[in-house]
Amino acid sequence: GIVVQTNPLYTERELQYQMADSGAKVILAMDILYPRVTKVLKDTKIENVIITAIKDYLPFPKNLIYPFIQKKQYGFSVKVEHKGMTHLFTEIMRVAETKPINLSIDIEEDLALIQYTGGTTGFPKGVMLTHKNLISNTSMCDVWMYKCVEGEEVILGMLPFFHVYGMTTVLLLTVMKASKM
C-alpha cells in the first residue's frame, strides 16, 4: 500500500479533497476523528475505515478511566462499533496473521508515500515519493547525526509525523538508527 498522511486538524473539506485526490481506499484514524471521517466518505474511494483509540494503549485502570477524561476534554465521547466498512484496529490485530507477508517491491519505482504540500499556491498537491526517496532523505539526516550510537539512542519526537520533515527526521531516522522513541 501507499501511505497518504493527513493532518488531524484538517477541515472536512480539506480531508475529503485529499482522500478523493489520492484515491485512498483505507483510512486509519483516531476515534475522536471518526465523526469527521464519516462525513467525508462519499465522493471518495474509501472502502474501509479503521479506528483506533488512545485508551487501547493505556494500562489498566487508565484504559477504563480515559473515556471519561476524553468526554470532559472534547465535550463528547466516541463509541465506534465494528460494522460494515468500519473496523477496530484492536480487532484487526487480534485476528491478524502473524506470519510475515512476502512481497516484492522496486525501491526505485514503487511509491511508498504521497505527501501533500501545504497548499500555499492553491489546493495542496500530492508529491509522490518512492521507497528510495525516503531512504535517501533519511540517509542525509543520518549524516548530520554522526555522533549517534546505533541502537543506543532515545529520540524525542516533537514534530508532527504527518509532515514530511517530522516523518523523515524523527520517525524514519529513529528506525534507521535502531533507536527508541
What are these regions (language model features)?
Residues 135-154, 162-181:
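Conserved AMP-binding/adenylation subdomain of ANL enzymes
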